Amino acid sequence: MSRNELDERIETYYVRVRGVVQGVGFRHATVREAHALKLRGWVANLEDGTVEAMIQGPGAQIDRMLAWLRHGPPAARVTEVTFEERRTEKRFERFQQQ
């Protein structure tokens, strides 16, 4: 299988998580979960109290991550998760907190 065929299997999603998601270890737990799923990208707090993330990897692993984000770590109270696929040539090297 060529490098291009492998790249075609990589998906990238932008995600916003709303609710009680700051000050509860959400970003740290998201990094741990992404590493466990071998995903790449980043997660960050926004000034409006939400969390945003860019998640990159195989579709099945992204689905698992999106399912996890719907509840997050125990102290979080997620009320909404929105996401959209992003077309990009950029390939992240790892998953990290911003």
UniProtKB/Swiss-Prot annotation:
Occurrences of domain Acylphosphatase-like (ranges): 12-98
GO MF entry, a single one: acylphosphatase activity
Family label: Belongs to the acylphosphatase family.
InterPro entries: Acylphosphatase, Acylphosphatase-like_dom, Acylphosphatase-like_dom_sf, Acylphosphatase_CS
Organism classification: Bacteria, Pseudomonadati, Pseudomonadota, Betaproteobacteria, Burkholderiales
Keywords: Hydrolase
Active site residues of this protein: 27, 45
One Pfam family named in its UniProt record: Acylphosphatase
Gene, per the UniProt record: acyP
Designated name of the protein: Acylphosphatase
Native source organism of the sequence: Burkholderia cenocepacia (strain HI2424)
PROSITE patterns, A to Z: ACYLPHOSPHATASE_1 (PS00150), ACYLPHOSPHATASE_2 (PS00151), ACYLPHOSPHATASE_3 (PS51160)
